[in-house]
């Protein structure tokens, strides 16, 4: 019985470590687009208010999406 408890504890701890390794790479904030630049008066200020370091309008032909980055 004691051996079963130790084995189950080992499995739980191993699962937690593996889960942490998978999740830790995704914790860093990725660039996020928050809306169109037409709707936001100042893209950079809107991003800073949301906790990002800066923001800029991006797009292929016309920069019309406000995207924030850390």
Curated annotation (Swiss-Prot):
The keyword Nucleotide-binding does not apply. It is found in: Secreted. The keyword Protein biosynthesis does not apply. One of its GO terms (cellular component) is extracellular region. GO terms for biological process: defense response to fungus; killing of cells of another organism. Disulfide bonds join 33-68, 37-57, 43-66, 47-67. Residues 1-29 form the signal peptide. Keywords: Antimicrobial, Disulfide bond, Fungicide, Plant defense, Secreted, Signal. Belongs to the DEFL family. This is Putative defensin-like protein 73. The lineage of its organism: Eukaryota, Viridiplantae, Streptophyta, Embryophyta, Tracheophyta.
